[in-house]
């Protein structure tokens, strides 16, 4: 079991690697002698308040940022640093003994108010950055926590007015990266006309999660798994994302994109590419992303026959107003909306390793639990001698909540009789690494930007292949006004989804569910 002392030792090693010129490797090093400036566009928004400012504070608190690093917010709202500080406080997780350092962090912050569609605000911003940097050589990071509608104007103004002349410049872009292949390609072409690919960091925060980053180690660092990771041994792969709440007043925003664009086309497909890709030449970011692109190119475009679409209804027995409110009852959603809040899609990979193995992606809102996981289901044991009682082995990678890795297998029940039962080999992080600190996904990713590692960011050709797979079905759903199947708030989703899983070689026995080391009877 890891101790608190060991955890601090690990942190010390990270800090040493970040700052020592003798320990330079891809994505683990920055120049601590050059000033860095981090600019947050959309500083008045929820993402900045709940994620970006807290992440920057945690990195500063743990001495993981180069010194000096300063921060500047930019938005249309007339705000002050003190007002931003007050709005962020509930999300900063400040301990009493950290108060002095917390005040030091905010002393490094500035704020500029301005429009996104004109030069004046950006000229004021650049003047402020030069003052913060004392007009010295400095590296600049620009985080666009903004709606896509202003991306083009903001990036043009950054390029023309705000770029560091002597240092490097990096631009972080939040999804959505377009609505389909055409709009995504238009955005990519626009960005390519302004920046080099190594300056662009398209962020998918799921790529920063502990167990998603662990996928490569699990696959390529264990002979027992790597040798069975193929169609000869694996029956199906189920990648799941479930949320127990609905749109909760954000229906108008969600209705513009839907669950496929919001979760499946990005988060789940990125996980699939890590599960299914071939072994890269090295751990260099481009080698890894090359293999991800190769496997994406092997995937057929989705069709309606491959999918189940759902939309939640209110539950009359719900314990609160949200649970009793259906999706189209949200006042910000049209009464005749066909936008799916649940989707299941079966992807087929046409290559030697995976031919015939269904990759099932499912995601939904207003379901029975919060869960994100990868479930690798192995084939039935040939020549079963246990009267058909043998269940399939499963390797389960739990992304959230409660990071874990466990392997479902058959063993003899303790006792005098010769009965068999399903149990697991369990690596639950909160048990094995009890005192270890697991960074938030944004901490990992923002630190990667400082270090110049693009391993966990989406490259333009990855994006192009992702939209190739999903654009035809998205257009068909919208043009033909495909009606989703209704399901009740708090349920497991449409029953048709379970049937689709069964049709695609996923077997569920219904007798066993993992609870972080405790087994119980439950519905999957």
Swiss-Prot record:
| Chief location bin | cytoplasm
Q: Which residues bind NADP(+) 1?
A: 42-49, 76, 175
The record's section on SUPFAM superfamilies has: Glyceraldehyde-3-phosphate dehydrogenase-like, C-terminal domain, NAD(P)-binding Rossmann-fold domains
Keyword Cytoplasm in annotation: yes
RNA-binding: is it a keyword of this entry? no
Q: Which UniProt keywords apply?
A: Carbohydrate metabolism, Cytoplasm, Glucose metabolism, NADP, Oxidoreductase, Phosphoprotein
> What cellular component terms from Gene Ontology apply here?
cytosol
Active-site residues, record numbering mapped to chain: 267 (proton acceptor)
Q: Which InterPro entries does the entry mention?
A: G6P_DH, G6P_DH_AS, G6P_DH_C, G6P_DH_NAD-bd, NAD(P)-bd_dom_sf
List of residues that carry Phosphoserine: 20
Entries under PROSITE patterns matching the protein:
G6P_DEHYDROGENASE (PS00069)
**Localization:** Cytoplasm, Cytosol
Q: What is its EC number?
A: 1.1.1.49
Q: Which domain of life is it from?
A: Eukaryota
Binding residue positions for NADP(+) 2: 362, 371, 375, 398, 406-408, 426-428, 492, 508, 514
Give the reactions, separated by semicolons, that this protein catalyses.
Answer: D-glucose 6-phosphate + NADP(+) = 6-phospho-D-glucono-1,5-lactone + NADPH + H(+)
Q: Which GO terms describe its molecular function?
A: glucose-6-phosphate dehydrogenase activity; NADP binding
Where, in this chain's numbering, is D-glucose 6-phosphate bound?
A: 175, 205-209, 243, 262, 365, 370, 400
Kindly state a single biological-process term from the GO annotations of this entry.
glucose metabolic process
Record family assignment: Belongs to the glucose-6-phosphate dehydrogenase family.
Protein function? Cytosolic glucose-6-phosphate dehydrogenase that catalyzes the first and rate-limiting step of the oxidative branch within the pentose phosphate pathway/shunt, an alternative route to glycolysis for the dissimilation of carbohydrates and a major source of reducing power and metabolic intermediates for fatty acid and nucleic acid biosynthetic processes.
Question: What protein name applies here?
Answer: Glucose-6-phosphate 1-dehydrogenase
Q: Which organism is it from?
A: Drosophila melanogaster (Fruit fly)
Give the gene name.
G6pd
């Amino acid at each position: 079991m890891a101790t608190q002392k060991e955890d601090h030792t690990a942190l010390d090693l990270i800090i040493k690697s970040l700052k020592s010129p003798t320990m330079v490797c891809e994505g683990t090093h920055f120049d601590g002698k050059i000033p860095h400036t981090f600019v947050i566009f959309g500083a008045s928004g929820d993402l900045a308040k709940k994620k970006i400012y807290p992440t920057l504070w945690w990195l500063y608190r743990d001495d993981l940022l180069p010194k000096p690093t300063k921060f500047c917010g930019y938005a249309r709202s007339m705000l002050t640093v003190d007002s931003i500080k007050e709005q962020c406080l509930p999300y900063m997780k400040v301990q009493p003994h950290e108060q002095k350092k917390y005040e030091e962090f905010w002393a490094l912050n500035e704020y500029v108010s301005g429009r996104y569609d004109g030069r004046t605000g950006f000229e004021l911003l650049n003047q402020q950055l030069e003052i913060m940097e004392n007009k010295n050589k400095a590296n600049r990071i620009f985080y666009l926590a903004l709606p896509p509608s202003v991306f083009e104007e903001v990036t043009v103004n950054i390029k023309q007015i705000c770029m560091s002349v002597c240092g490097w410049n990096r631009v972080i872009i939040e999804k959505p990266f377009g609505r389909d292949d055409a709009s995504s390609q238009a955005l990519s072409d626009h960005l390519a006309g302004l920046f080099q690919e190594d300056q662009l960091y398209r962020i998918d925060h799921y790529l920063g999660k502990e167990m998603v980053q662990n996928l490569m180690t699990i696959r390529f660092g264990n002979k027992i798994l790597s040798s069975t990771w193929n169609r000869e041994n694996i029956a199906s792969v189920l990648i799941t994302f479930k949320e127990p709440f609905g749109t909760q007043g954000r229906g108008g925003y969600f209705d513009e994109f839907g669950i496929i664009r919001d979760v499946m086309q990005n988060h789940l497909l990125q996980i699939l590419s890590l599960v299914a890709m071939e072994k890269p030449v090295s751990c260099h970011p481009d080698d890894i992303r090359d293999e991800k692109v190769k496997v994406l190119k092997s995937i057929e475009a989705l069709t309606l026959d491959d999918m189940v679409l759902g939309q939640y209804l209110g539950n009359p027995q719900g314990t609160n107003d949200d649970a009793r409110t259906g999706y189209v009852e949200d006042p910000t959603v049209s009464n005749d909306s066909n936008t799916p809040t649940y989707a299941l899609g079966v992807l087929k990979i046409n290559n030697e390793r995976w031919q015939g193995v269904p990759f099932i992606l499912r995601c939904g809102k207003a379901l029975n639990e919060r869960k994100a996981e990868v479930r690798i289901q192995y084939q039935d044991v040939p020549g079963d001698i246990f009267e058909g009682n043998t269940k399939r082995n499963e390797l389960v990678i739990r992304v959230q909540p409660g990071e874990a890795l466990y392997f479902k297998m058959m063993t003899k029940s303790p006792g005098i009789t010769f009965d068999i039962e399903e149990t697991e080999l369990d690596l639950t992080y909160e048990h094995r690494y009890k005192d270890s600190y697991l960074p938030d996904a944004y901490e990992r990713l923002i630190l990667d930007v400082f270090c110049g590692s693009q391993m966990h960011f989406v490259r333009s050709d990855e994006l192009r292949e992702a939209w190739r797979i999903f654009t035809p079905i998205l257009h068909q759903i919208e043009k033909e006004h495909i009606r989703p199947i209704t399901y009740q708030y708090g349920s497991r989703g449409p029953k048709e989804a379970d049937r689709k899983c069964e049709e695609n070689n996923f077997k569920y026995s219904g007798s066993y569910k993992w609870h972080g080391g405790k087994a119980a009877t439950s519905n999957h």
